[in-house]
Regions:
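C-terminal helical subdomain
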Residues: 97, 205, 232, 256-297, ...
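Juxtamembrane interface at the ends
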Residues: 185, 251-255
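Residue-level detector of alpha-helix boundaries and kinks
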Residues: 120, 131, 197, 253, ...
Length: 326
């Protein structure tokens, strides 16, 4: 209960201190014809991002576990765009991620913008299909596989002279700052915990995710240029479905607090849209935004040694689960 109360207090404090330093993009900013992949786009923040990108002229691919086909129909209706398609993926199953990538390879010429948004905080400890801690698997490992395949299959193409850099935007969280250091000796290992410890493990998964974002930026832009723009952000506290796993007794308490003090998904989508569509974000890499303000991520996430260690350790974790291995 203490962790939940602390999280609510922090979220309300974030709203009270909110002073945007970056202006939201005007609706006149267009991305006509750009292919945009958005994970977790069936509700909440992901759905708001999908609507915004579709309104701006993007061809939006909504990669979701559920919400088929009604979420896609709603995005089409609210954006006024028919260039919206739903794709099936379960990010808790690496085989499902590979199936999505196989489908994209045969149906999609390229990905210009990838928004890795899907997230969750389960009521109690859960395992992914391959036996990893669930939040580690969804927030980091699935994204590691997805990005790797998009690059390997030639859908995410690093820019050369005269071409525009594709963008990868990871939706993370300020909870990464208070997380314990990454345990490389037990990376991704399932541990049993209850809901009251969920926020702690959520923060650990987000530290891993932020570390990945910084290392991915270094790996793809080794000479300091921007061939692929890789960014991460915390959108702030959102009135969305991420608290759907809260105990039933808490839901009547949480609902009015979230409605009063948390951001609507549409407002929380503003920094995501900025990183996806602005000229400035396309010319740089490695940005981290907290709502509409640029900040440095936690030192642990920015540390190149941590990044390199995570890269090699996760590569070893994934090897037994590559397609064609038993």
């Amino acid at each position: 209960m203490k962790s939940i109360t602390g999280a609510l207090r922090a979220a309300i404090g974030q709203r009270a201190k909110e002073r945007p330093a970056i202006e939201p993009l005007p609706k006149s900013r267009r991305i006509d014809g750009k292919v945009c992949l958005v994970t977790g786009a069936n509700s909440g923040l992901g759905k708001a991002v999908a609507i915004d990108l579709a309104e701006r002229g993007g061809r939006v691919l909504m990669a979701c576990r559920s919400g088929h086909p009604e979420a896609g129909e709603d995005v089409r209706r609210r954006s006024g765009s028919d260039a919206v398609q739903m794709l099936k993926v379960d990010l808790a199953d690496l085989a499902s991620v590979h199936r999505l990538c196989d489908e994209l390879r045969t149906t999609t010429p390229r990905i210009d913008i990838a928004v890795l948004n899907a997230g969750l905080m389960p009521r109690q400890a859960s395992q992914s299909k391959q036996g990893f801690e669930l939040m580690f698997a969804v927030h980091f490992l699935a994204n590691r596989v997805l990005v790797g395949r998009l690059l390997e299959d030639g859908l995410l193409r690093p820019a050369d002279a005269g071409s525009e850099a594709p963008r990868i935007v990871l939706v993370s969280s300020e909870t990464h700052r208070g997380a314990e250091p990454i345990d490389f000796d037990h990376l991704g290992a399932f541990v049993n915990y209850s809901f009251k410890d969920g926020l702690k493990h959520y923060g650990q998964s987000k530290l891993t995710q932020c570390t990945f974002a910084q290392e991915l930026s270094r790996q793809l832009n080794p000479a300091g240029e921007t061939r692929v723009a890789v960014h991460a952000l915390c959108p702030g506290p959102i009135n969305s479905n991420i608290a759907r796993e809260a105990p039933l007794l808490l839901k009547p308490v949480l609902a009015p607090i979230m409605k009063a003090f948390f951001l609507s998904p549409a407002k929380a989508a503003l920094p995501v849209t900025y990183l996806c569509c602005s000229d400035a974000a396309g010319e740089r890499t490695g940005l981290y935004l907290h709502m509409m303000r640029e900040k440095a991520p936690a030192p642990e996430a920015s540390d190149p040694q941590n990044g390199a260690k995570l890269w090699s350790a996760s590569e070893a974790l994934l090897r037994p689960h590559a397609p064609g291995t038993s």
